[in-house]
Amino acid sequence: MNLFLNQWKENVKKYGSRPAIVDRDGTRETTYSELDALSGRICTALKKKGVGKGDIIPVCMERRMEFLAAELGILKSGAAFAALSPEYPKERVAYILKDCGAPFLLDDDFLEEASGEPLAEAEEVSGEDGAFAVYTSGSTGNPKGILHSHASLAAAVARHRAFFLPKESDVQLSCASFSFVAMMIHIYTPLSPG
């Protein structure tokens, strides 16, 4: 199975100067190479903090390109991410941090730290390794975390790509919250074909 990080690496080589993401008002465009460089710096900063396989790092910031770069940086470090909304109550964020054993929350302050780091290569991951954790709403008590593997992400992206984005030139609008599970498909499917 061609895991997402392998597809990403190929696409950065093939389509480095192409736009990977455009903000909602069309004023900010980020290429595959730019997104890859920022995520590589984030990966370096994470590795310096001892982050790697088996870790889950929650990301909490406004919906923008840097959120995606943070997720990619976490994946490159070998860890899994949990996307959190900045609108979550502090108690919910604290519970999720404790539940997933996260050493810290990746936020805007962390991005500032990572901005001067050198680029790091992605760690090798297997299909069984964790890629991202999604937390339930917690409507019946505390939120419950569900860890999804790299194989699960790759299979979902492949299915959605074949159906919704069969051509490289296709684009996709993404408007759901980054903390919503369907968002993983909305983000990673368009990035996989280039």
Predicted region positions:
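Carrier-protein-dependent adenylate-forming modules in NRPS/ANL systems
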Residues: 1-151, 165
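Conserved AMP-binding/adenylation subdomain of ANL enzymes
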Residues: 144-173, 177-194
